From Swiss-Prot:
Keyword Ribonucleoprotein: yes
The protein, known as: Small ribosomal subunit protein uS3
Domain KH type-2, first and last residues per copy: 39-107
GO MF terms held by the record: mRNA binding; rRNA binding; structural constituent of ribosome
Entry function: Binds the lower part of the 30S subunit head. Binds mRNA in the 70S ribosome, positioning it for translation.
Similarity annotation: Belongs to the universal ribosomal protein uS3 family.
InterPro entries: KH_dom, KH_dom-like_a/b, KH_dom_type_2, KH_sf_prok-type, Ribosomal_S3_C_sf, Ribosomal_uS3_bac-typ, Ribosomal_uS3_C, Ribosomal_uS3_CS
Pfam families named in the record: KH_2 (PF07650), Ribosomal_S3_C (PF00189)
Cellular component, GO, one term: cytosolic small ribosomal subunit
Classification via NCBIfam families: rpsC_bact
Organism: Helicobacter pylori (strain P12)
Oligomer and partners: Part of the 30S ribosomal subunit. Forms a tight complex with proteins S10 and S14.
Protein's GO biological process: translation
Length: 234
């Protein structure tokens, strides 16, 4: 089951939180969901250059607060906050409501699954070989402290006539372990041959009562090369 479902949805309420946080009535729920979708699409499009990892939307009474987690927050804020004010005005025009925006920085961008997936997708659009793009992202994540990473690409790879799926994995990615801190990201590459889907899973450690505890026993053993595996399917 852990291999099939979204790893974030599987761990909601355990070690992951919702990205839309509000309690609506049955009457307002559809409009709130549609509004959240519009906000996310707008911010993803307008702030693509800043490396947006996550967008959290919170509602309380008539207040709406949006938290943008990005790799380059300085580009969003701009000089003296000019750029962030433009984004606020754009959101206000879109949803006809006052919005407060908070900006947070991603601590380790190379170990963020969403940013890694978008990185691979961008390289594929620039016609970089898919294997090279995947391995480059995997090496960067492991150097940033990730315990394991799995990258999967699907579509007409290298312009092949028949679409297929290929994936690489290094280290451990325990998808069935609910206490495992698994970060998941998805992106699409718009190539001349069609759309290529990119999925990334990154294992950051196990979440216990005192936070994330990394595997000390494994680190104490003699150093050995991380496990590598690859699979292609037509």
């Amino acid at each position: 089951m852990g291999q099939k479902v979204n790893p974030v949805g599987l761990r909601l309420g355990i070690n992951r939180n919702w990205t839309s946080r509000w309690f609506p009535s049955a009457r307002t729920a559809p409009s709130n969901i549609d509004e959240d979708n519009k906000i996310r699409k707008f911010l993803k499009k307008e702030l693509y250059y800043a490396g947006v990892s996550e967008i959290v939307i919170e509602r309380a009474a008539k207040k709406l607060r949006v938290t943008v987690v990005a790799a380059r927050p300085g580009l969003i804020i701009g000089k003296k906050g000019v750029d962030i004010e433009k984004v606020k005005e754009g959101l206000k025009t879109l949803i006809k409501k006052e919005v407060s925006i908070n900006i947070k920085e991603v601590k380790r961008p190379q170990a963020d699954a969403q940013l890694a997936a978008e990185n691979v997708a961008t390289q594929l659009e620039k016609r970089v070989a898919f294997r090279r793009a995947m391995k480059k992202v995997m090496q960067a994540a492991l150097k940033s402290g990730a315990k394991g990473i799995k990258v999967c690409v699907s579509g007409r790879l290298a312009g092949a006539e028949i679409a297929r799926t290929e994936w690489y994995m290094e280290g451990r990615v325990p998808l069935h372990t609910l206490r495992a801190k698994i970060d998941y990201g998805f992106a699409e590459a718009m190539t001349v041959y069609g759309i290529i889907g990119v999925k990334v899973w990154i294992f950051k450690g196990e979440v216990l009562q005192k936070g994330i505890q990394f595997e000390k026993k494994e680190e104490a053993k003699e150093e050995r090369e991380p496990r590598r595996s690859r699979r292609g399917r037509q």
